[in-house]
A protein has these predicted regions:
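Sec-dependent bacterial lipoprotein signal peptides
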Residues: 1-6
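Transition segment at domain starts
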Residues: 7-58, 139-159
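Residues that cap or initiate secondary-structure elements
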Residues: 11, 33, 69-73, 86, ...
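Short structured motifs
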Residues: 45-51, 63-64, 95-97, 108-112
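Mature extracytoplasmic domains of secretory-pathway proteins
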Residues: 49-93
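Short edge beta-strand segments in beta-sheet-rich domains
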Residues: 75, 108-110, 151
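Short, solvent-exposed, Trp/other aromatic-anchored flexible loops in extracytoplasmic proteins
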Residues: 84-146
């Protein structure tokens, strides 16, 4: 008599995480393998001002950004961070090219970064790694998951 007990085959699943790219005001967006996507992301300008929906919370960072070369309706996403003079992140969020639309079809948008100490903000930087890819990890799916993943999103205290 042949008896089989549960499946114990090892699928050989491996997750890898991309290295975080060099942050800048203008960056070439890259995929999880570090290859350029043909898209440039740029912080056009920024200023400190109260958010119109929560003016009592004081100044926040209001910034404008642009994606050149992005596809209509879908495309990359990058982390935007307000930084101090030492390039330490004071507040970050992911901005999506698909949410950036301006006149004449250009991919421009604006967003807000809430920071604890707005007086310390020296600039807004973008991290070139495309954050729009959300493939399954080995932990989520040992058979079909794994492979390269974008770096962990930037957060407060990260040196960029």
């Amino acid at each position: 008599m042949l008896a089989l007990s549960g499946c114990s085959a090892h699928w050989g699943c491996t997750d890898t995480t991309a290295e975080r790219g060099e942050a800048g005001v203008r960056v070439r967006v890259e995929d999880v393998s570090g290859r350029p996507l043909g898209v440039i992301a740029e912080v056009v300008d920024w200023r400190l001002e109260p958010h119109p929906q929560v003016p009592d919370e004081g100044d926040q960072v209001h910034f404008h950004y642009r994606f050149d070369g992005a596809d209509e309706g879908s495309g990359p996403a990058v982390d935007a961070c307000a930084v101090d003079e030492e390039r330490v992140a004071l507040g970050c969020r992911t901005v999506y090219s698909a949410e950036a639309f301006g006149p004449d079809g250009d991919h421009t948008g604006d967003d807000w970064l809430a920071v604890e100490h707005p007086e310390q903000v020296a600039g807004v930087l973008l991290i070139p790694n495309d954050q729009s890819y959300h493939g399954r990890t080995c932990e989520q799916d040992v058979k079909d998951g794994g492979g390269p993943h974008p770096p962990k999103p930037a957060g407060v205290g990260d040196r960029l």
